[in-house]
Amino acid sequence: MGRTLENKKEIVADLKETLGESTLALVIEYQGLTVAEITDLRKRLRPSGTVCKVTKNTLMGIAIQDDEKWQPLSELLKGSSAFLLVKEDFSSAIKAYQEFQKVTKKTELRGGVMEGRLLKEPDVKALGDLPSKEQLMGQIAGAINALATKIAVGINEVPGGLARALQAVADKENGGDDSAA
C-alpha cells in the first residue's frame, strides 16, 4: 500500500524540521545495505547528533524547495539516497560514516551541503579531518592557559629580577665598603 498524501506531508514537515536544526547534510548511496547495517550506521552517528533519514528523493526535494540554504542538495537527489543530517559535530559524524564505510564498503558518498554550498567528496573528507568541537575547545583552553601561565611567570619575574638587582647593588656597595675599611 502506498503512502497517503497526509503521510507524505508529515514526512516533508519532519524533514524540514530536521534540516532547520542541521548544519550539514550528506547524501550517500545506500543501495545494498541491509536493515541491520542501516541500524548500525544510525547507532554510530547518534553520539555526534546526526540523524540518518532514508526517504524518497522527491520528498526531500519538496522539503528543500523553499529553503535557499539547502537548494544545492537538489543536484545530489538521484538513485537510492540516504541523508545524514548533522546537527552539531560534523567532524565526528563524518569520521563515524568513514569508519562505517571501511567496514561495509557498500555505500558511496555523493556529496553534501553546508551553509548553502555544495560539497564534493574531497570537501567532505577535508571537513572530517578537522578536529572535533571538544578537541578544538581543549586546544583553545590549553593555549589560553599557557598564555596565562607565561604572563604570571613574567609578572612574578619583574619583582624578582628587581630584588636580585637591588641585592647585587647592595652587595657591591657592602663589598666596596669592606675593602675600604
Swiss-Prot record:
Q: Which UniProt keywords apply?
A: Ribonucleoprotein, Ribosomal protein, RNA-binding, rRNA-binding
Instruction: Please provide, alphabetically and separated by semicolons, the GO molecular function terms listed in this UniProt record.
Output: large ribosomal subunit rRNA binding; structural constituent of ribosome
One BP term from GO: translation
Q: Which GO terms describe its cellular component?
A: large ribosomal subunit
Q: Does the keyword Zinc-finger apply?
A: no
One Pfam family, short name = Ribosomal_L10
State the protein's purpose.
Forms part of the ribosomal stalk, playing a central role in the interaction of the ribosome with GTP-bound translation factors.
Q: Assembly and partners?
A: Part of the ribosomal stalk of the 50S ribosomal subunit. The N-terminus interacts with L11 and the large rRNA to form the base of the stalk. The C-terminus forms an elongated spine to which L12 dimers bind in a sequential fashion forming a multimeric L10(L12)X complex.
Task: Give the family this protein belongs to, as stated in its UniProt record.
Answer: Belongs to the universal ribosomal protein uL10 family.
Protein name stated in the entry: Large ribosomal subunit protein uL10
- The protein's organism comes out as Nostoc sp. (strain PCC 7120 / SAG 25.82 / UTEX 2576)
